[in-house]
Design a protein with these regions (language model features):
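Beta-propeller domains
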Residues: 2-8, 12, 20-44, 58-108, ...
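WD40/WD-repeat beta-propeller blade N-cap
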Residues: 44-50, 108-115, 162-178, 215-221, ...
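WD40/WD-repeat beta-propeller blade-loop signature
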Residues: 49, 62, 114, 177, ...
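Loop/turn segments within WD40 beta-propeller blades
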Residues: 55-63, 119-129, 182-188, 225-232, ...
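Conserved beta-strand element within WD40/beta-propeller blades
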Residues: 66-72, 132-136, 191-195, 234-238, ...
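Short coil/turn segments within WD40 beta-propeller repeats
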Residues: 73-80, 138-141, 179, 197-201, ...
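Short loop/turn segments that connect beta-strands within beta-propeller blades
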Residues: 85, 146-148, 205-208, 248-251, ...
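Asp-box/WD-like beta-propeller blade repeats and closely related beta-sheet repeat scaffolds
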Residues: 147-185
Length: 431
């Protein structure tokens, strides 16, 4: 992760002057849906550094849209919606192909503070027509995409991105920057935010009211996520080096799932580095299929830690594939065993951790080796899986099947690339 981004999220310092070098990139594992994707890499050059990133959750052509958030030091940040250029008509004779344009901007709005996270509203099927998304920075903000009546129904025409609501805790005078948030998949009226003031706040986004605020950690909270398919349970990580689990039905207590181990003593008997005692944990991700598993990582660490909340205390796996600090982790939305991580070594690594869908599953040493890696042109700071387009988001992890996996990654040089791979997964003899 770029140091100036990490510093802003962690300490609220001013970013460095290297902001104009950041890149944004989109990633996927290659299969051509209905002949749609013709190239290995699709690129979008953002006009500013990018950190916030999320695929649309709606099905159909709208699944090709990305929400993109800038991260610059002035109060002049932007939220942008881009889309793959004319996906239904992308052929060798199209205007976009001849002009070498892969993505087009369809909406943009001002967002004063840097965007620490952006998410589209969870989709539950049906004929819902609202197009909502949310961001964090100074506040939790809800946005709506409004189509121009003259262009209604025309794909990729310019639309309006308007602020629907700004959620503020009226009981708090000081506005502490928000480091992250999550939107509940079962009850889309619920969202939870994390802040550098050590708190997490649960919101009702329909009423705009804070349901509860709690002191979650001893120091800054850097990330928060709902337990998959639960409305009352969420976990957080922070500067105190711990992963904590909370239940909204019993907030008097929390469960510490993991704490940074103390530093190993040197030969002289003293600790080698006392600062390691509270090495911050920066991000976490719940497994979307087998929710007992959490992926997280320490600041300035090359290792991804896998935890099982049924067995707190020690990691069930430690994934070592990066050669520079890890910046992001995200489980596949369609396969319990697939995880992707990105780092300062310019790699987005895909891991196959074996069958985690059954109770008491274990991760063998065999599964702690990378399955494959995408080599980017600069540091990978963020990633997101595409979930809704039928041939894009579905992972068919079965014997000898061609498997398409699609996601997106944010880089350090202002570009967005859609990258594709075609892989085959075989049954292996696992010890």
């Amino acid at each position: 992760m770029n140091h100036w981004i990490r510093n802003w999220i962690i300490t609220d310092r001013n970013p460095s002057s290297n902001a104009n070098r950041m890149n944004f990139q989109v990633s996927s594992l290659r299969q051509e849906p209905k002949g749609l994707l013709k190239k290995e890499v699709y690129e979008y050059k953002a006009p500013w550094p990018v950190y916030g990133l999320d695929w649309s959750k709606l099905p159909g052509e709208k699944a090709f849209r990305l929400a993109v958030g800038s991260f610059i030091e002035e109060y002049s940040n932007k939220l942008e919606i881009i889309s793959l250029a004319e996906p239904s008509t992308y052929d060798d004779d199209s205007y976009y192909h001849r002009s070498n344009i892969d993505f087009v901007k369809i909406a943009e709005a001002d967002h004063h503070y840097p965007i620490t996270k952006v998410l589209w509203e969870p989709y539950k099927g049906g004929s819902k027509t609202s197009d909502l998304l949310a961001t964090t920075g100074d506040y939790l903000k809800l946005w709506e995409i409004v189509s121009d009546e003259a262009n209604n129904g025309i794909f990729n025409r310019r639309q309006q991105l308007i602020t629907k609501q700004t959620l503020k805790n009226k009981k708090v005078d000081f506005k502490a920057p928000l480091t992250s948030f999550d939107w509940n998949q079962l009850d889309s009226s619920l969202a939870v935010t994390s802040s550098i003031d050590t708190t997490c706040t649960v919101w009702n986004v329909e009423t705009g009211q804070a349901k509860t605020q709690l002191i979650a950690h001893d120091k800054e909270v850097y990330d928060v996520a709902f337990f998959t398919n639960e409305v009352d349970t969420f976990a957080s990580v922070g500067a105190d080096g711990s992963v904590r689990l909370f239940d909204l039905r019993s907030l008097e207590h929390s469960t510490i799932l993991y704490e940074t181990p103390p530093p190993q003593p040197s030969k002289t008997g003293s600790s080698s580095n006392s600062s390691n005692q509270q090495s911050p944990l920066l991000r976490l991700s719940f497994n979307k299929i087998s929710p007992y598993y959490i992926a997280t990582f320490h600041m300035n660490s090359t290792e991804v830690i896998i935890l099982d909340i049924r067995a707190p205390g020690l990691p069930v796996a430690e994934l070592n594939g990066h050669n520079a600090p890890v910046n992001c982790v995200n489980w596949s939305p369609n396969s319990s065993n697939i995880l992707c991580s990105g780092g300062d070594d310019c790699n987005a690594i895909v891991w196959d951790l074996g069958d985690l869908s059954t109770p008491n599953s274990t991760i063998s040493k065999y599964n702690q080796d990378p399955l494959l890696a995408y080599r980017a042109t600069s540091e990978v700071n963020q990633l997101s899986w595409n979930t809704k387009y039928p041939e894009w988001g579905k992972l068919m992890v079965t014997t000898s099947y061609d498997t398409a996996m699609y996601g997106c990654t944010a880089k350090y040089d202002k570009s967005i690339d859609l990258w594709t791979f075609l892989i085959k997964l075989y049954n292996h003899n696992r010890d």
